[in-house]
Amino acid sequence: MSQESNDDSLGIDKLSVDYDYLLYKIADYVSSIEFQTNQICKRQNELITKDIVNGIVDENIKHFREILTKCEKLENYFDMLDQINMITENFKTRLAQVARDYKELQKP
């Protein structure tokens, strides 16, 4: 009987080795899946973060362009004011000349 237990007639030792090997393969497979899942999640996170950052950057660029457009319009308004100032200065000079001419005509 002791020899039968040494011979492992029921195959318990082999079953134990097979079981351990199966657990090892399962753990290895789970680790592989975990690694791939982590890589995919990291990549997705990078894409989302990058897209969010890019979206924010794109939105900021859009706002800066709008501000730049407003600044250009403002600059045009100042140019118009300068032109109006030149016209009014010229008009004042001409009006003063007309007033002098009128006074000359009024003299007897």
UniProtKB/Swiss-Prot annotation:
UniProt keyword Transport, yes or no: yes
Function field: Component of the biogenesis of lysosome-related organelles complex-1 (BLOC-1), a complex that is involved in endosomal cargo sorting.
Keywords assigned by UniProt, alphabetized: Cytoplasm, Transport
Subcellular localization(s) per the UniProt record: Cytoplasm
Organism per entry: Zygosaccharomyces rouxii (strain ATCC 2623 / CBS 732 / NBRC 1130 / NCYC 568 / NRRL Y-229)
Record flagged with keyword Transport: yes
Family, per entry: Belongs to the BLOC1S4 family.
Disulfide bond positions: none
Single GO BP term: endosome organization
Subunit structure: Component of the biogenesis of lysosome-related organelles complex-1 (BLOC-1).
InterPro entries from the UniProt entry: CNL1
Protein name as it appears in the record: Biogenesis of lysosome-related organelles complex 1 subunit CNL1
